[in-house]
A protein has these predicted regions:
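Membrane-embedded alpha-helical bundles that constitute the cytochrome b-like, heme-associated redox core
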Residues: 1-135
Length: 135
């Protein structure tokens, strides 16, 4: 009884690229932000601090552009890019959530109803972060 596994990508390349750009930019923003914040303790010179702030802002722009592209793709992208597949306030979500509560072991192609809530929370947090640049 040999079963052959087939690799199937649920998310298109654009979504996977969006995720990896977020991983890289958010990680860099945190590390550079901490270095800037602890500059005196770490012995960072004024010139180095200015350079780090410039790099930090540039990476912030990359993060913002990536997020804006994803927000737009939610309206004009392929089927799994669309907000109707990703966010929790679309038609049929309440039924999907009720079904999930009754049978949480159900397999979903994409996000389950709780995952959709998390996606919404992350998109809101990232949009606030992009708009303020302070978080």
């Amino acid at each position: 009884m040999n079963k052959t596994r087939t690799l199937t990508y649920v998310w298109p390349k654009s979504i996977r690229l969006f995720h990896w750009i977020n991983v890289i930019t958010i990680s860099l923003l945190i590390v550079i932000g901490l270095i800037i914040f602890n500059g005196k303790t770490l012995g960072v010179t004024v010139d180095a601090k200015i350079m780090l702030k410039t790099i930090h802002v540039t990476i912030g722009y990359i993060f913002a552009i990536n997020l804006i592209i994803r927000l737009v793709m939610g309206f004009i992208g392929s089927s799994n890019d669309m907000w109707s597949q990703t966010l929790p306030f679309m038609k049929g979500y309440k039924k999907e959530l009720t079904k999930f509560r009754r049978s949480p072991k159900q397999v979903y192609k994409g996000h389950n109803p709780i995952g959709k809530l998390m996606v919404l929370a992350l998109l809101i947090a990232m949009t606030i972060q992009m708009a303020t640049g302070l978080i």
